[in-house]
Regions:
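Catalytic cores of nucleic-acid endonucleases
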Residues: 111-158, 364-366, 372-445
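Nuclease catalytic cores
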Residues: 9-25, 276-348
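Active-site metal-binding core of divalent-cation-utilizing nuclease and nuclease-like domains
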Residues: 43-99, 334-377
């Protein structure tokens, strides 16, 4: 899109932990009064690629130019429970990993109330409370964004509780479906809580789901008792703070209580199922980072020390990683992407023809990218790996490992041939020929300098 020289140019930087997506960028810019037209899509996000005598070289970042808006996009790695996206003005410096001057912070998910009440709302709040704890003086606009998710006309009580806590903590809520941005606070007439008593009454009024251990709250004078299970109750996570939805909820209500009360409160956590040896190890935890200096006691346990808050919120991604390789391959290939899982970026379904989708189970093994070539009637499953982990990537492409996922693909595309390949990050693209005879072909290679090839 042409940039008019008569309009003053504006420059921004977006930092993201995920593959850059236009919907999140639009919502962040809209939050500060800058509108990106509906006609702008992910195709307008251009990889920063240069060419020399050696070949094409990716600079590890992207650019988006819309009218007078110039947006530079970079990947970052969080040092704690970091938000998914951050928007900064052009004067920001990133070498110290300080996010206090962010204009907007945004957490994104595709999970909705109908698919998972707790992970869609409560689990996400800890990202915001952690940021607020680290940067209490920040003026960043906080945005929770449900991207490409479907919400019913009537919310569950659990979702209403989570929405009201978000509103109490000044978190803006938006969803997007079929290109439309929806203000969730307005759609569902969400109101913030006005007192600690109101939070307690509302939470205790929610009926217990059969088979679940409900969270219950009570207050006696200046002490608030919170009965909440904080471990997963099995395996390596038994006795450890590991129940992410409940951790998010606990962080949310503690911070909401603190905001609404005039007099300092003491909080006693009961029925938590956390063992003393967990606290003795003083583990770094997003929970501790999100409730710094709040007076909290775990019944039956002694907390001798709390982990210190990290000095840095993030570091910029400076190396060519598996995630960068799969994101770049996804962007330079012209085929339709029907599934992507770039380094854990959330995508919970496979796209079929005519807007048909099939959900991928949370524990189902999955590849990094799946492409569709309608001309050849082919589906291409891609696994991204670092050079030293190629053998692992080959195993993960096996029919045995991907049995459930391939079954979903065959349901959606019974007439298509399924092929497999690797997307690798290697020391130098000059060495690519040594992988010509492995079980699955190398479809894309990115080296440590940023040079890439489509073999």
């Amino acid at each position: 899109m042409e940039i008019s020289s008569s309009i003053p140019q504006k420059y921004f930087t977006v930092l993201t932990e995920e593959a850059p997506n236009i919907d999140e960028i639009k919502v962040m810019l809209k939050s500060i009064g800058e509108i990106i037209p509906d006609t702008i899509s992910n195709k307008n996000i251009i990889s920063n690629i240069t060419t020399d005598k050696k070949g094409n070289m990716f600079k590890g970042e992207w650019n988006l130019k819309v009218n007078n808006l110039n947006i530079n996009i970079k990947l970052f790695k969080g040092k704690t429970s970091s938000i998914d996206y951050m928007l900064f003005d052009d004067n920001s410096k990133f070498e110290h990993g300080n996010a206090s001057n962010a204009l907007v912070i945004l957490e994104s998910t595709k999970t909705s109330d109908s698919s998972s009440r707790n992970t869609a709302v409560n689990q996400r709040i800890v990202k915001f409370t952690t940021y607020d704890t680290m940067y209490p003086e920040s003026n960043a606009i906080k945005v929770m964004f449900w991207c490409d998710s479907i919400w019913n006309d009537k919310l569950t009580d659990t979702a209403i509780m989570g929405f009201r806590l978000m509103d109490t903590l000044d978190i803006n809520m938006y969803s997007q479906h079929n290109g439309n941005i929806i203000n969730m606070k307005e759609k569902y007439n969400i109101l913030p809580f006005s007192s600690c008593d109101e939070i307690i009454k509302f939470k205790n009024s929610i009926k217990q789901k059969k088979g679940n251990i409900s969270i219950r709250l009570s207050i006696i004078e200046n002490i608030i008792n919170i009965s909440i299970k904080l471990d997963k109750g099995y395996g390596k996570d038994f006795g450890r703070i590991s129940h992410d939805p409940n951790v998010g909820f606990l962080s949310a209500i503690l911070n909401a209580f603190e905001k609404l009360t005039i007099n300092p409160k003491k909080y006693i956590i009961k029925n938590h199922n956390i063992e003393q040896k967990y606290f003795d190890s003083n583990p770094k935890s997003k929970f501790w980072f999100s409730i710094n200096e709040i007076d909290i006691e775990f019944e039956g346990c002694i907390i001798k020390d709390r982990p210190e808050i990290p000095e840095r919120y993030f570091t910029l991604e400076t190396e060519m990683t598996e995630k960068l390789a799969t994101i770049l391959y996804d962007q330079v290939l012209s085929y339709e992407t029907i599934f992507s899982n770039h380094g854990g970026c959330a995508l919970t379904y496979i796209k079929g023809h005519n807007d048909i989708i099939l959900s991928v189970g949370q524990k189902m093994p999955r590849p990094d990218i799946v492409f569709r070539n309608d001309e050849r009637k082919e589906i291409e499953i891609i696994e991204g790996k670092l050079e030293r982990e190629l053998s692992k990537g080959i195993k993960q492409l096996s029919d045995t490992h991907l049995k459930g996922f391939i079954g979903l693909l065959k349901q959606l595309y019974p007439d298509y041939t399924i092929k497999k390949g690797l997307c690798i990050t290697i020391s130098s693209i000059d060495c690519i020929n040594k992988y010509s005879d492995i079980e699955f072909p190398v479809k894309f290679a990115l080296d440590n300098e940023g040079y890439f090839i489509l073999p």
